[in-house]
């Protein structure tokens, strides 16, 4: 019994072999300008050789929205992975609060970069008896607005 392979099937397999490496080789990059599901805007400057980065964060939400100002962020990422994990801290200039984010940079099925994050927001309280309400937890998904020239 002789099996024959369709020329169309061979062409499809050859195409997949040529295209697949370029899909997996694409690396998700934190550097650039991002927006989240709430409308906040974050800019991450170039990541250095140790994986460290700085940037700015302009939140769209706050307890006192009239006082919102651009705030600095400082972070680090794993550099070897094509979809790296990372963490950063935002020091809010307009309140006695700090937020830490941790997440991963993904390339979705459409080839778009997305940052999936979880965060802890710690607000200052005047007495230890109010500690129970000083930390909030949540998540944000960020999508790229544009890249930042290095």
Curated annotation (Swiss-Prot):
Glycosylation-annotated residues: 67, 93, 141
SUPFAM superfamilies, sorted: Avidin/streptavidin (SSF50876)
Domain of life: Eukaryota
Disulfide bond keyword on record: yes
Chief localisation class: secreted
GO CC entries: extracellular region
Domain named Avidin-like: residues: 26-147
Keywords: Biotin, Disulfide bond, Glycoprotein, Secreted, Signal
InterPro entries in UniProt: Avidin, Avidin-like_CS, Avidin-like_sf, Avidin/str, Avidin/Streptavidin-rel
Binding locations of biotin: 36, 40, 57, 59, 63, 95, 140
Disulfide-linked positions: 28-105
One Gene Ontology MF term: biotin binding
Residues making up the signal peptide according to the UniProt record: 1-24
Note in the entry: The sequences of the coding regions of genes AVR4 and AVR5 are identical.
Subunit structure comment from the entry: Homotetramer.
Protein role: Forms a strong non-covalent specific complex with biotin.
Family: Belongs to the avidin/streptavidin family.
Protein name: Avidin-related protein 4/5
């Amino acid at each position: 019994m002789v099996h024959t392979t369709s020329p169309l099937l061979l062409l499809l397999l050859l195409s997949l072999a040529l295209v697949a490496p370029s899909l997996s080789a694409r690396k998700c990059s934190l550097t650039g300008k991002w927006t989240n599901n709430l409308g906040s805007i974050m800019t991450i400057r170039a990541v250095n050789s140790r994986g460290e980065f700085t940037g700015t964060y302009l939140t769209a939400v706050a307890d006192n929205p009239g006082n919102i100002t651009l705030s600095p962020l400082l972070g680090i990422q794993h550099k070897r992975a094509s979809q790296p994990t990372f963490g950063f801290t935002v020091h809010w200039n307009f309140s006695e609060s700090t937020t830490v984010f941790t997440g991963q940079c993904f390339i979705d099925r459409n080839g778009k970069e997305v940052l999936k994050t979880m965060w802890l927001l710690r607000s200052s309280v005047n007495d230890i008896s109010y500690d129970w309400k000083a930390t909030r937890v949540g998540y944000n998904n960020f999508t790229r607005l544009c890249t930042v020239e290095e």
